[in-house]
Structure formats: structure tokens, C-alpha cells
């Protein structure tokens, strides 16, 4: 080891001398004001070359440990990235919808699950609640759930195109409340019969334009067709509106029906803090509506009035924010997609534990090589290399290993995304769709590399050259004690992962 270290130091000295001659020649022909800049640039490039050269030599000399380190960290970083795509998707669900913080779905007490609410109401009640509070900016009927795409056809001249389209039913107020924006055409045209609007993605995919007609019953695309009057901008993908491909105006359908409780209503408040105000103002509206529904007036019997008051005591109106919809547990038969907050927190904890295991493995590998590298490190010190340079060299080696691991992790993620295993997640693990998660993974990896190498680097460079021949940390009681602590901690983390 010392012979190799001497050779490396000699090569480094020759390289430094050669480059110094070049920089001197350049400086002699450059203005004096540039001399400090040239020298700074020279030493920075020289130091980078020194670290890179040592990193390559380390890979060559310690092939087995380097390979195991890279593979282990690649699996850990890949697993961390995949898990975090799901966690990021769930915590971001509905969060970027415009005005999501002050947009709420109306819910009433569930008849089937005491203490919970459901979002199904009749249109007369929904309209009354929307119009009965001064805190409402706008509101209307909307559809948070989506069905399966249905086969439909459209005709372009002599060509008929077969498509699959998922449509949803909204009222005009619901369209305004959910902030539909027309990219082409006009959403106001939806008030006309037999019209619909489609999303930008659907329009581009199928070549649909404003003025086209779509039929669900005629393969020729003509009979019973609906006219496309607008193309609306796509919504956030991981949201209840991300599935909307087509929308049409429900008009006055079921507007007078008090027996069809299969509609959902949404309101946008003037301010998010007015939630309790709306819930309070909704109760007189509920009383008036229910009294008409059950014909409770002055002519009603005392027993009927008592039962009615008892029912009102159990009645309440609750607003559930769009931002809370995904994780909320207060709804029975929740519309749209739903998630489990406990599961996501557990997944987040697992991701962190995986990184900790990888970090411990990395530190153990580093300390396992201390006896083999100690002599060469002190040879460098004898030849005048400063301790800070050696520490930075070890940190540079760690960063290099992490970068190799990240490259391999990207390949593993790509293979996972192309395999059937990716179906177990509801998130898209593609790197292009998860730039923030990718940036987080790289940041965590680099921080782990630097943090995990600082103490070992400081330790291995702390010995005086004259004392190196007297013993070995690898066989000392302190060395064994540290390794046992790390292995025990790693074992505890593994047990925690199994339990989770």
C-alpha cells in the first residue's frame, strides 16, 4: 500500500509541477489582475483531478467492496425513490387544484354509519344550500367519481374514428366552481342541448376539434351525436378532476325531484375561514326543506312535530375541503379516490429506514477498509498532503460511489416501471413525471454520502504517521465495539421493517 501511495504521490507531484509551468506561462502573458483568478482556477482543477484520480484507484484496488457498496446503495436509492413517488402522489392529491383550499363538498350525516357523513343529496336541497349562505361565491352540482370509458365515434369527412371517452355530468355552477377553463370554444355553449366539452389531452389524442360531433350509439358518428363546443385545459393529473375527459351540462335534470339522492354539490367560499359560517347558515335551510318534504306545518300532529325535531337534532351539514378529500375518514362511501394517511406515513418511515440501512452499510464498509488504507493515508501525509485534503478526498470518493449508485438506481427504476410489479402502485414511477422526487433522492443520497464519510475520514486521518505501525483500529476494542453497535442498530431497523 505504501509503495502505491508513494507512486501516486510522485505522479501527483509531477502533474502539479507540469501544470504549474503551464499556468506560469499563461500568467506571464495575461494582465496582472487576472493572476489570482488563474491561480485559483488552477488549484481547483488540480484538486478535482487529484480526487478523481484517487477515486479511480480506489475502485481498482477495492473492487469487491466498491461493487457491493454501489449495488447496495443503488437498491436502497431505487427503493426510496419508488416509495417516495407514491407518498408524493398521495400527499399531493387535489392539492394543486385552483382554489382547492376554499372549495368544499357538501356532506350530510350517513344513515348507515353513525358518526360519518355522505355526499349524496337531491338537487333541490343542493341548490337551496348553495343559495342559502352569504359566504358562498359560487356552487353547483359536480361529479367526483368517474366511470369506465365508453366507446364512441366521430366522423371527419369520410373517415369515422372510434374512441373511448369518460364523461361527467356537471351543472353550470359546478363548472364555474371547479374552475374549468376553455382552451378553445366557449364553455357557455354547454347550456345548449346535446353539447359537451372535452379535455385538451383527449382532443389531441383523437384529433377532436370544436364543432365535431360524437355519438355513443351510431358507429357512423352521426345519429344521437353531441356537438363539441369547447376544449378545456387539463387539470392536475393526481386529482379527482384529472380523470375528466368530457363534461356536459346537466341542465334542469331532476331539479324538482326530492326522491333522487344521487348528486353531489360543491361550493366555493369567499374565504376558507367561512366554513363554520356556512355550516351554521345551512341549518335553517335544512329545516325549511325538510319541513316541506315531510309536510310539517301547523296542521301536523304533536307526535309528528316531536319526531321531526328529534330528526333535526341529529341533522347537520358538514363541508369537506377538496384538499382533505383524499385522506378524510369522516365520509361514508367517499367519492373519487381515497388513501390511508397511516399507510403513507408508514411508507415514509420505511423509506427513511432503508436509507439508514444503506448509510450504515456504507460506514461499515469504510471502517472495514481502515486497516488496509491506514498505511497509504499516512504515506500521503509524509509527502506533505494536508489532512483537510485527505478528508475531502474521502468525501469525494463517497460522492463518486453515490453517483455511480444513482446511475444504477435509475436503471433499476426503469426496469421496475416496465415490469408488472409497478401495478401495485397507483403512482407513475417515471422519472420525467417525478422531477421533485428525483431531486429529493439525489439530495438525500449526496447528504448521506457526505454525512456518512465525514467521521470515518476524520478518524482515518487522525493518526500520527509515526504511530501507524503500532496497531490497527480494525482489531482494537474500540473498532469492534463501533462495528457491533452499527450492526446491532442495523439489525433493529431490519426488525422494524419486518414488523411494519
Labelled PLM ranges:
Residues 80-213, 220-224, 280, 292, ...:
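Structured, solvent-exposed hinge/loop segments at the ends of secondary-structure elements
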Residues 52-64, 68, 358-401, 462-474:
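Intracellular coupling helices
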Residues 44-52, 57, 61-65, 288-351, ...:
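Membrane-helix entry/capping segments
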Amino acid at each position: 500500500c505504501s509503495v502505491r501511495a508513494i507512486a501516486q504521490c510522485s505522479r501527483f507531484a509531477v502533474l502539479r509541477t507540469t501544470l504549474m509551468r503551464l499556468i506560469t506561462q499563461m500568467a506571464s502573458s495575461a494582465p496582472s489582475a487576472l493572476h489570482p483568478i488563474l491561480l485559483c482556477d488552477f488549484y481547483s482543477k488540480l484538486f478535482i483531478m487529484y480526487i478523481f484520480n484517487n477515486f479511480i484507484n480506489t475502485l481498482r484496488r477495492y473492487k469487491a467492496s466498491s461493487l457491493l457498496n454501489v449495488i447496495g446503495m443503488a437498491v436502497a436509492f431505487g427503493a426510496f425513490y419508488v416509495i417516495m413517488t407514491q407518498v408524493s402522489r398521495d400527499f399531493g392529491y387535489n392539492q394543486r387544484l385552483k382554489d382547492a383550499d376554499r372549495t368544499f363538498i357538501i356532506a350530510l350525516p350517513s344513515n348507515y354509519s353513525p358518526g360519518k357523513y355522505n355526499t349524496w343529496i337531491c338537487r333541490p336541497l343542493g341548490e337551496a344550500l348553495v343559495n342559502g349562505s352569504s359566504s358562498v361565491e359560487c356552487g353547483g352540482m359536480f361529479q367526483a367519481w368517474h366511470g369506465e370509458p365508453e366507446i364512441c365515434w366521430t366522423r371527419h369527412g369520410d373517415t369515422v374514428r372510434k374512441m373511448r371517452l369518460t364523461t361527467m355530468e356537471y351543472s353550470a355552477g359546478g363548472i364555474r366552481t371547479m374552475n374549468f377553463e376553455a382552451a378553445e370554444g366557449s364553455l357557455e355553449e354547454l347550456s345548449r342541448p346535446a353539447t359537451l366539452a372535452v379535455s385538451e389531452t383527449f382532443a389531441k389524442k383523437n384529433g377532436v376539434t370544436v364543432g365535431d360531433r360524437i355519438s355513443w350509439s351510431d358507429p357512423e358518428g352521426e345519429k344521437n351525436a353531441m356537438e363539441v363546443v369547447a376544449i378545456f385545459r387539463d387539470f392536475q393529473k393526481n386529482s379527482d378532476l384529472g380523470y375528466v375527459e368530457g363534461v356536459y351540462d346537466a341542465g334542469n335534470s331532476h331539479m324538482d325531484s326530492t326522491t333522487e339522492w344521487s348528486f353531489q354539490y360543491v361550493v366555493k367560499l369567499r374565504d376558507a375561514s367561512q366554513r363554520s359560517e356556512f355550516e351554521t347558515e345551512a341549518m335553517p335551510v335544512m329545516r325549511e326543506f325538510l319541513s316541506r318534504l315531510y309536510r310539517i306545518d301547523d296542521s301536523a300532529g304533536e307526535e309528528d312535530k316531536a319526531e321531526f325535531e328529534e330528526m333535526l337534532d341529529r341533522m347537520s351539514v358538514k363541508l369537506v375541503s377538496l384538499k382533505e378529500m383524499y385522506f378524510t375518514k369522516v365520509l361514508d362511501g367517499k367519492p373519487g379516490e381515497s388513501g390511508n394517511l397511516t399507510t403513507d406515513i408508514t411508507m415514509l418511515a420505511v423509506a427513511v429506514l432503508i436509507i439508514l440501512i444503506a448509510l450504515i452499510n456504507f460506514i461499515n464498509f469504510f471502517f472495514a477498509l481502515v486497516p488496509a488504507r491506514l498505511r497509504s493515508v499516512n504515506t500521503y501525509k509524509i509527502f506533505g498532503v494536508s489532512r483537510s485534503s485527505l478528508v475531502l478526498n474521502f468525501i469525494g470518493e463517497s460522492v463518486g460511489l453515490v453517483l455511480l449508485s444513482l446511475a444504477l438506481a435509475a436503471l433499476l427504476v426503469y426496469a421496475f416501471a416496465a415490469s408488472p410489479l409497478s401495478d401495485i402502485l397507483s403512482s407513475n414511477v417515471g422519472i420525467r413525471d417525478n422531477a421533485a422526487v428525483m431531486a429529493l433522492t439525489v439530495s438525500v443520497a449526496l447528504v448521506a454520502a457526505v454525512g456518512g464519510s465525514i467521521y470515518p475520514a476524520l478518524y482515518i486521518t487522525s493518526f500520527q504517521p509515526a504511530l501507524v505501525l503500532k496497531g490497527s483500529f480494525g482489531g482494537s476494542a474500540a473498532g469492534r465495539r463501533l462495528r457491533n453497535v452499527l450492526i446491532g442498530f442495523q439489525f433493529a431497523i431490519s426488525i422494524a421493517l419486518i414488523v411494519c
